[in-house]
A protein has these predicted regions:
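Zinc-dependent deaminase catalytic domain
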Residues: 1-337
Length: 337
């Protein structure tokens, strides 16, 4: 059985990033097997402060990636660690250390980043290391997950009120105070309207969750496709409207048809949101990275970015590429400190 890292051992390494990466790699190499489909091990160590205000303590939480035979059901090491925080009162993540089987220091995936953005502060330190500790990168969470979901801190019973208030703010800010250089064009507003019309607010949809979404994409020939949201009672099986539109994007790409040029996702209250994690991943892995995305920022102003901006590489580290993934069978040995 894998021996967990003790709090004392972790805290002895706090000021030494190489030592922290060594601990994570030690745990990785001690795993009895790799996940069954990727054959790629990832370890995430979370250093946390937990407990009621009068009796706060520190904890080290270990997370490991796991997979079923269908790869869509995989869970990353970071999310595996985060689920363990459910047993603690008021957990605060102080530092995260991540290592993998790769010869490069590999970034957390977009799903991991999105999940972290709801649980950790934007300035939370993340330390990445490669499989032998020879490459180390340190940065803050906000550097790798821009344009987060504006409702990420609300509970279900707060969502509708928050959505209504923020939607009103969006309308007020962009009819009175917005600078024309920051606002959307008439053509972009028409795309926004198409997405808003696609939002399904039927009782069945809103009984599953109080926020619903629609999305629309414009292609280079000025044709527009839109889609609503497909939520499920098993929340993790829900499919966002941008994911549903990816099928149309894929058909046109395969047919060498017109490229997608603009995209927007909106909720029933009128707030435009950047795509969620699964859609961000699909857009950047399969389609052109210069797709323009319309969104409202956290001040409720109309903004645009490119799809590539949704998934920035971490400073001093890499995304896991197909070539790097296939080259990870030589899984590295620990460098002694």
């Amino acid at each position: 059985m894998l021996e967990p890292i003790s709090l004392a051992e972790f805290e002895q390494c706090r000021d030494n990033k190489e030592a922290l990466v060594y601990l994570a790699n030690r745990q990785r190499l001690a795993l009895h097997e790799a996940p069954s489909q990727s054959l790629f091990r990832v370890v995430a160590l979370f250093y946390c402060e937990v407990g009621p205000r009068a009796n706060r303590t520190k904890e080290v939480i270990e997370g490991y990636n796991a997979e079923q035979s269908y790869i869509g059901g995989a869970i990353c090491a970071e999310r595996a660690a985060l689920t363990q925080l459910r047993k603690y009162t008021d957990p605060m993540i102080l530092e995260i250390v991540i290592t993998t089987d790769s010869v490069e220091a590999i970034s957390p995936g977009i799903l991991c980043r999105e999940y972290l953005s709801t649980s950790a502060e934007p300035d939370t330190t993340i330390v990445l290391g490669n499989n032998d500790g020879s490459i180390i990168s340190t940065f803050a969470l906000h550097e790798i997950h821009p344009y987060p979901y504006v409702y990420r801190r609300y509970r279900r019973d707060q969502m509708a009120r928050a959505g209504e208030a923020f939607g009103l703010k969006c309308r007020q800010c962009n009819t009175k105070n917005n600078n024309e250089s920051m606002g959307w064009s008439e053509k972009e507003r028409a795309l926004y309207d198409a997405a808003l019309k696609a939002v399904d607010t039927s009782p069945r949809i809103l009984s599953l969750h109080p926020i619903s979404f629609g999305a629309a994409v414009r292609f280079a020939d000025d044709s527009v496709e839109s889609s609503g949201y497909l939520p499920a009672l098993e929340y993790g099986a829900s499919v966002c409207p941008v994911q549903l539109l990816c099928r149309e994007l894929d058909k046109r790409v395969r047919a060498d048809g017109p490229r997608p040029v603009e995209l927007v996702q909106v909720d029933q209250y009128g707030t435009a949101h950047c795509p969620f994690a699964s859609a961000r991943t699909l857009l950047n892995e399969h389609f052109n990275k210069d797709l323009k995305v319309l969104y409202h920022d956290e001040e409720a102003l109309e903004r645009t970015c490119l799809s590539a901006d949704l998934c920035p590489p971490p400073p001093g580290a890499s995304f896991l590429t197909h070539d790097a993934f296939l080259g990870t069978k030589d899984q590295g040995a620990l460098r002694l400190l």
